[in-house]
Design a protein with these regions (language model features):
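Catalytic-core helical/loop segments in enzymes performing group transfer/polymerization on anionic/lipid-linked
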Residues: 1-238
């Protein structure tokens, strides 16, 4: 379960909505990668500098921050080439007529994975989804695994996903998109599979059916498709 007190009863949500004003969805506090990076570095370096005062402090991240930053330096060096490749692959995908499902990944250390899902790691979730897709999805369907924008590259998803897909006989139908525009993908996708990522909200806005693999604050009847994943591949319901 999540720790949210937000109701999950559709009737109760509608009753609350009937008393609320029309929301202003215009961004008030726009963010940026530079701002988020500055906040992250400041937080972690302060923790490192004051470690002698708090020797029992435990990090919430699975990796040491300096190792994480080293991986980010490598990622940033190849960002332009990676973005061009992702957009090219996305354009090719959108030109095809076969239906496809999008699986947006979450970062490996995401507490929503570690504390609010049946998976110990994101890699376990990936293996679960590919196995289900290989066994039960329609033969013409494709699965697009979309990396998280803040993935540090410590795991090579293109290699890992490719190997799992080939081992399960769906190597030609499963692809990894390391970049691209999630909104454009969701607008064309037959469905979105997620553990409990906020990417589910983007899917709602695009009118794309969402299937959850774990608990989430938006796991509400009539909002997400609660069918088993094996059924969702065939009849995704918005």
């Amino acid at each position: 379960m999540t720790l949210s007190r937000f109701p999950d009863d559709p009737a109760e949500i509608r009753e609350i909505a009937s008393r609320a004003d029309v929301p202003d969805l215009s961004p008030r506090y726009p963010g940026s990668f530079a701002l988020e990076a500055w906040q992250d570095v400041t937080y972690h370096l302060t923790n490192l500098a004051t470690w002698p005062l708090f020797p029992r402090h435990e990090r919430h991240t699975p990796q040491h921050p300096l190792a994480d930053y080293a991986r980010w330096c490598v990622r940033l060096a190849g960002a332009s080439a990676r973005r061009r490749r992702a957009l090219r692959e996305q354009d090719e995908l959108l030109r095809e007529q076969d239906p496809f499902f999008v699986f947006p990944l979450q970062v490996e250390g995401d507490y929503q994975i570690r504390s609010h899902s049946p998976f110990a790691t994101m890699a376990e979730a990936v293996q679960h989804v590919i196995a289900s897709f290989a066994c039960t999805a329609p033969e013409r369907a494709r699965l697009v695994v979309k990396t998280h924008p803040l993935d540090n590259g410590v795991r090579n998803w293109r290699v890992d996903v490719g190997k799992s897909a080939r081992d399960l006989g769906v190597g030609e139908r499963v692809s990894v998109l390391d970049g691209g525009e999630l909104g454009e993908l969701l607008a064309r996708a037959a469905g979105c599979v997620t553990v409990n990522s906020t990417a589910g909200f983007e899917a709602f806005l695009a009118g794309t059916p969402v299937n959850l693999l774990a608990s989430a604050v938006f796991d509400v009847e009539g909002v997400v498709d609660r069918q088993p994943l094996e059924t969702f591949w065939h009849e995704p319901c918005p």
